[in-house]
């Protein structure tokens, strides 16, 4: 079966004379041969400024990397912007900056949601790469492709795939690295709606340009193309060959699940995960697996398919189960919203948490406690609030802005005091400031709802005074209860 992918693509080459470069890619190539737009920009800076930057470039790059590591968003963006005109940003720093931006927006808005500011910054990085071709490594293109895909910007990812393919001949001849880049480009083209023939050209290039040395990537391409374009016979043979060849990586699993789920093949994605002899070396990232669980639940409105994946992880990679536990607990609340059966939800959560407490590898995170606070709100049961606090104390967990948002939501529906509410609010302000996020209307309205939802509190007058103080601070006005 090892030569299976090569056989498929040799047929494609014979039938369509497939080549990587077509008119679109030839047009895109001019982006990389045109003179850099910044070629004369540095002359607008004084000689002293230019000399200072040259002498201190390593220190400035270190400062930028330190700011990213500390998650100082405002400072990072400012430092990056100040360094960009001098052309001293190296490939590794650029790659870290892309991941810094995208991971932050995914943390705030979830997968598939992007704000205009982040999108503008990504587009700006792409322009920088066009002007400074030396930073456009294979890893750079892969990160750019994955970023736009994670943000569901498939049309843009498809365009970047064309750019990366046109740039391929300028990259160092490392077959494994280039093979993976071809797979990322194929992923983007499939999700961008490319035809079977267009996808086949990329698959053919893996064999043709890399001289048949990347068998696993060839097989992955066959598996993706023939699953999406619904040739079950070839798809099954490709999958069997991949399992037998034992060369899959976590990167491949991420790509396969991303393509299948985004093309509506959620059950095939779950089947791939469970039936490919995956282990800690080639399981998808936990971020991708959590996303798959969410999409499986949306497709089946049941926790059962999720629990089979959870049990698989428990057997082959128990170190990852905390994130999966958090996801399943959160989705159990969506199940409750459908069933409206408090006893069923309570029994499931209690049984599930008890099961996890017997697993020695299970180490709750602050997200686990946050989820318990959310459960307390949904079920209007103070015992889950207490369970969350106990977990924070027992495991020494560090609360985040999400923790205090969740607490304020819980205090809307459960017995609460002015002291509890004011402490949660002050901590929320502090945590938001620490990650360079301003207090927005949604936070103000959450505080209003929290205080106005229980007019019969014993200390409601103190609550109203606190609310007016906060509203005055942010220039807001009280809304009628």
Swiss-Prot record:
It comes from the Eukaryota. The keyword Protein biosynthesis applies. Disruption phenotype: Exhibits growth arrest on glycerol medium. Gene3D superfamilies: Tetratricopeptide repeat domain. Disulfide bonds: none annotated. GO terms for cellular component: mitochondrial matrix; mitochondrion. GO terms for biological process: mitochondrial gene expression; regulation of translation; translation. Keywords: Activator, Mitochondrion, Protein biosynthesis, Repeat, Transit peptide, Translation regulation. PPR repeats lie at residues 137-172, 365-399. Residues 1-55 form a transit peptide. InterPro entries: Pentatricopeptide_rpt (IPR002885), TPR-like_helical_dom_sf (IPR011990). Mitochondrial RNA-binding protein involved in mitochondrial translation. The cox1 mRNA is one target but it is not clear if ppr8 has a single or multiple targets. This is Pentatricopeptide repeat-containing protein 8, mitochondrial.
């Amino acid at each position: 079966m090892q030569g299976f992918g090569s056989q498929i693509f040799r047929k494609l080459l014979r039938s369509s004379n497939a080549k990587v470069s077509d008119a679109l890619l030839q047009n895109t190539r001019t982006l990389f041969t045109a003179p850099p737009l910044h070629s004369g920009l540095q002359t607008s800076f004084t000689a002293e400024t230019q000399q200072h930057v040259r002498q201190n470039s390593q220190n400035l790059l270190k400062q930028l990397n330190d700011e990213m590591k500390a998650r100082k968003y405002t400072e990072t963006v400012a430092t990056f912007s100040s360094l960009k005109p001098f052309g001293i940003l190296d490939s590794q720093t650029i790659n870290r900056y892309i991941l810094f931006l995208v991971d932050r927006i995914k943390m705030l808005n979830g997968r598939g949601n992007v704000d205009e500011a982040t999108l503008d910054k990504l587009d700006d990085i792409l322009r920088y790469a066009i002007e400074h071709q030396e930073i456009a490594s294979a890893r750079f293109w892969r990160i750019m492709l994955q970023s736009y895909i994670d943000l569901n910007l498939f049309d843009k990812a498809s365009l970047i795939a064309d750019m990366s393919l046109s740039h391929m001949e300028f990259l160092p001849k490392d077959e494994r690295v280039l093979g993976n880049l071809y797979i990322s480009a194929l992923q983007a083209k499939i999700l961008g709606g490319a035809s079977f023939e267009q996808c086949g050209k990329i698959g053919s290039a893996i064999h043709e340009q890399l001289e048949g040395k990347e068998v696993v990537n060839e097989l992955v391409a066959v598996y993706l193309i023939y699953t999406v374009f619904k040739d079950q016979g070839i798809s099954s043979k490709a999958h069997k060959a991949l399992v037998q060849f034992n060369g899959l990586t976590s990167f491949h699993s991420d790509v396969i699940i991303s393509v299948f789920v985004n093309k509506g093949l959620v059950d095939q994605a779950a089947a791939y995960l469970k039936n490919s002899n995956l282990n800690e070396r080639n399981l998808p990232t936990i971020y991708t697996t959590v996303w798959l669980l969410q999409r499986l639940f949306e497709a089946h409105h049941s926790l059962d398919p999720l629990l089979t994946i959870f049990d698989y992880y428990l057997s082959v990679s128990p170190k990852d189960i905390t994130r999966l536990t958090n996801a399943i607990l959160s989705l159990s609340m969506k199940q409750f919203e459908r069933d409206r059966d408090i006893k069923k939800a309570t029994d499931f959560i209690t049984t599930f948490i008890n099961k996890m407490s017997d697993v020695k590898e299970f180490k709750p995170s602050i997200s686990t406690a946050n989820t318990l606070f959310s459960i307390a709100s949904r079920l209007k049961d103070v015992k889950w609030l207490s369970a969350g606090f106990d977990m924070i104390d027992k495991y020494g967990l560090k609360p985040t802005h999400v923790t205090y948002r969740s607490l304020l939501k819980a205090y809307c529906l459960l017995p609460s005091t002015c002291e509890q509410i004011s402490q949660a609010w002050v901590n929320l302000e502090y945590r938001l400031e620490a990650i360079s996020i301003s207090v927005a209307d949604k936070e103000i309205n959450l505080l209003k709802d929290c205080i106005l939802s229980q007019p019969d509190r014993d200390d409601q007058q103190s609550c109203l005074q606190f609310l007016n103080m906060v509203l005055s601070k942010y220039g807001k006005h009280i809304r009628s209860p």
